[in-house]
Amino acid sequence: MSLTQIRKQELMTEYQAHETDTGSADLQVAFLTERITQLTGHLKANPKDHASRRGLLKMIGRRKRLLSFINAREPERYQALIKRLGIRR
């Protein structure tokens, strides 16, 4: 259920701040958003999978904290990121 290497590379080229960026907050939010999307689809097909639901809620909380971090420091970067990711917030 994790991200494939190919998809991870695609996300990295799209969201990384510079060539050697592997863990910026923007990139982490992009990875989490992709995994959240995958897990949401999984849970629609498997509604009784409570362990995955708990993992999904943890990921959503982590993404929320990262977005709050970005918003506190650079609100315009935050707005651009949520617009690019299509996150309604």
Curated annotation (Swiss-Prot):
Protein's UniProt keywords contain RNA-binding: yes
Keywords assigned: Ribonucleoprotein, Ribosomal protein, RNA-binding, rRNA-binding
SMART domains, alphabetized: Ribosomal_S15
Keyword Ribosomal protein: yes
GO BP: translation
GO molecular function terms attached to this record: rRNA binding; structural constituent of ribosome
A UniProt-annotated Pfam family: Ribosomal_S15
GO cellular component: cytosolic small ribosomal subunit
SUPFAM superfamilies per the UniProt record, alphabetical: S15/NS1 RNA-binding domain
InterPro entries the record matches: Ribosomal_uS15, Ribosomal_uS15_bac-type, uS15_NS1_RNA-bd_sf
Family classification: Belongs to the universal ribosomal protein uS15 family.
Function per UniProt: One of the primary rRNA binding proteins, it binds directly to 16S rRNA where it helps nucleate assembly of the platform of the 30S subunit by binding and bridging several RNA helices of the 16S rRNA. Forms an intersubunit bridge (bridge B4) with the 23S rRNA of the 50S subunit in the ribosome.
Oligomer status and interactors: Part of the 30S ribosomal subunit. Forms a bridge to the 50S subunit in the 70S ribosome, contacting the 23S rRNA.
Record-given protein name: Small ribosomal subunit protein uS15
